[in-house]
């Protein structure tokens, strides 16, 4: 019996795959537990439509990520921070991914999720710093920060 997997099933198939499985296994396990549905011509057509829509959505997300990268790669795109500095040259507060994301939105109107900004630890130094940001699995950019003394 041909089925379309609705979820990943270890050793049998991944979500969206069409595979031939034993009839009893399909009816008694996969279909009952909503892990798969019977592959009729109508359900195969629905699956192809969903896959095309998903590909189109992924292409739009990739294009948006590339547009954000183009803005971040410009020399004039430098996020300005003014922080109070102690006698040892370190800032009193620290600059976190959340703060960087908010300032980027405020200064340039570019929205970047704070979870995409790759910071090993919060920034506490002054000067020019480049922070990597993973916009998409295929697109990585750098945010330029200019941290000055207030």
Curated annotation (Swiss-Prot):
SUPFAM superfamilies from the UniProt entry: L9 N-domain-like (SSF55658), Ribosomal protein L9 C-domain (SSF55653)
Any Gene Ontology biological process: translation
Pfam families reported for this sequence: Ribosomal_L9_C, Ribosomal_L9_N
GO cellular component: ribonucleoprotein complex; ribosome
InterPro entries listed in its UniProt record: Ribosomal_bL9, Ribosomal_bL9/RNase_H1_N, Ribosomal_bL9_bac/chp, Ribosomal_bL9_C, Ribosomal_bL9_C_sf, Ribosomal_bL9_N, Ribosomal_bL9_N_sf
MF annotations from Gene Ontology: rRNA binding; structural constituent of ribosome
Key words, A-Z: Ribonucleoprotein, Ribosomal protein, RNA-binding, rRNA-binding
Keyword set includes Methyltransferase: no
Cysteine pairs bridged by disulfides in the record: none
Role summary: Binds to the 23S rRNA.
Family, as annotated: Belongs to the bacterial ribosomal protein bL9 family.
Stated name of the protein: Large ribosomal subunit protein bL9
